[in-house]
Amino acid sequence: LLCSFAVKAKEELLLGEKVKDVLVTGATGGVGSIAIMILSKMGYDVHAVTGKKDKNDYLKDLGAKNIIDRKEFEGESKLLEKGVWDGVVDTVGGAALTKILAQTKPGGIVALPGNAGGIKINTNCMPFVIRGVKLWGIDSSGSSIKRREFVWNEAAKLIDFSKVQTFTKELSFNELLDVYPKLLKGELSGRTIVNPNK
């Protein structure tokens, strides 16, 4: 939810200029799935990035307008590419972020809540200096109580919790040992919660 409000902030920063096209990476993961749901409910055209071709229907059901293969964000990037994205929720980070920044439109906001693709990026100043792109780190664990209360009040309006239940799994510590290799291979989707009392 914090990511979605970061993207929405572009409208306030640019005095009402409307956000239209929003990119969400790691779209089948827990954060990506919820971001798609929220951003589509906010009225944006959500473009979901995934490497899991069997999840297209799942992503469309969450509200994605378009599905993009993550391979589109591999390889070398120019200093600046055609501006495509008004906003981005990048749960992946790493090498793909370089290309994403180069493709973000003037004044665009890239919210970065994760680093599943790596902690390093190889970028340049051009997206920031020429286009005024903003890269916002999202740290939900360090948010104030006031901010958390605001977010949870908004969550009730923007999140379909019955859908969240369909992609959330609860595991015991013992079950985690079986699931962890799949996580490392990128074979999991949705949200996995470890319940120490299970």
Residue ranges and their predicted role:
Residues 146-198:
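C-terminal hydrophobic helical "lid"/dimerization subdomain
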Residues 21, 45-46, 109, 134:
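Residues at the starts of beta-strands that form the adenosine-phosphate
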Residues 32, 56, 97-98, 120-121, ...:
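Short, well-ordered alpha-helical microsegments
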Residues 40-95:
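Adenosine-nucleotide cofactor-binding segment
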Residues 1-41:
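Short internal alpha-helix immediately C-terminal to a glycine-rich phosphate-binding loop
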Residues 95-161, 196-197:
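Glycine-rich phosphate-binding loop and adjacent beta-alpha segment
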Residues 39, 59, 88, 100, ...:
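Terminal peptide-recognition signature
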Residues 13-20, 71-85, 142-143, 163-164:
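Short, flexible, glycine-rich and Lys/Arg-enriched loop motifs at helix boundaries
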